[in-house]
């Protein structure tokens, strides 16, 4: 077991503002879980291992800033630049900021929560074309666009996030592209890193209080070893951490690049389940991104897992589907022993009613609860690493795998109305939302045919079903539009 005195000797960050210290490591050498603390100016220190919340369009879905300040237990939020630059002069670049942190002011995040800015969402929506030699393809709220490394660096300098993730040439359509493409991805990322961290930019970032995390691509080590060597030998003095897109590369970093070992590791390798999070922690990840939280809340599922796992008979589910009829009269909390606002103030029957009534509060309570469950999960991991060390953590991880089902439950009800960021950018996608309007027709067969035609046309155009009918008023009048049937007419007074 290694303590902070031996690991953190050269670990204080070279850039002003951010400090990361390793308090304990579960193995003397090689990839292993580690206990640490990340400090950012004017933000609440983040004890690691921990997680960052995933935002959408600059907000944590379903939770308003005032409720974040009251109930949030996470220390940072992941933001995507493509969410804010939908037009030539975006509002985010012109907003006055009293504390000289425009991104924080624009998103109205609580003062305690740090901002982590990257070019693309995580996970990102596929673009029609891949990245170019000097630009990253992005998906804004008004369509697809390109942003160059210089433009991204200039925007970071203006927005002043607490942490900025360097530009990376990520997978476009295939997760296993040809080796020539992988080599080009590594070379581009190295070139973009040099442009992003030019001497002039380094000074500007330092004065703005921006800490830069360099990307580690999700390509084999044999292909990007030169990029990693460049980071370790030439760029390490200019970066504050690593943004890892494939945690399986961490053992190679530990074994071959000592200058990169003390840096904090932010995992952008998307975990599908809590068990995948435990594996990332065991490899040495300090901060995880957990996008499935938003998906689970949207589906109407309340998470119920803990770490260490609770003793029980049989395999337990990772969550509870709050749409099920069995919750109609249940006055129990969403999870026994949970101290979140939803569990201490309301009960299952109330949340079940809200979901069925399509009340926004239902998803808000689920989101607050689910973030609390994940916060408690990471707190349990830290306590285990602190008290039980690596052996205790591995033993409880195996027990967790035996106690809970391998997959998260799927909600059986209707999710909130899908927005643009829910779409994946795939060819010929099926409609997520049912059509809200249909063309009027006296004949049921004609009505069904007309409605289908409208929906197909909307699919082709990529728009919502039109509110206005496509026929004139005379045609509608011939079909009896707005007429009251004789037997339903209002009786004479």
Label each PLM-derived region with a short phrase.
Residues 2-205, 320, 325, 481, ...:
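Non-catalytic, usually N-terminal nucleic-acid engagement modules in DNA/RNA processing proteins
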Residues 138-139, 334-336:
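Short glycine-enriched loop/turn motifs at secondary-structure junctions
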Residues 44, 156, 214, 280, ...:
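Conserved, mostly hydrophobic/aromatic
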Residues 2-5, 187-190, 194-334:
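Glycine-rich phosphate/ribose-binding loops and adjacent secondary-structure elements
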Residues 154, 278, 341:
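Surface-exposed charge patches
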Residues 69, 157, 232, 281-282, ...:
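Alpha-helix boundary recognition
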Residues 75, 162, 237-240, 286, ...:
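Short acidic/polar active-site loop segments enriched in Thr and Asp
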Residues 2-37, 52-53, 158, 168-175, ...:
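C-terminal extensions of enzymes
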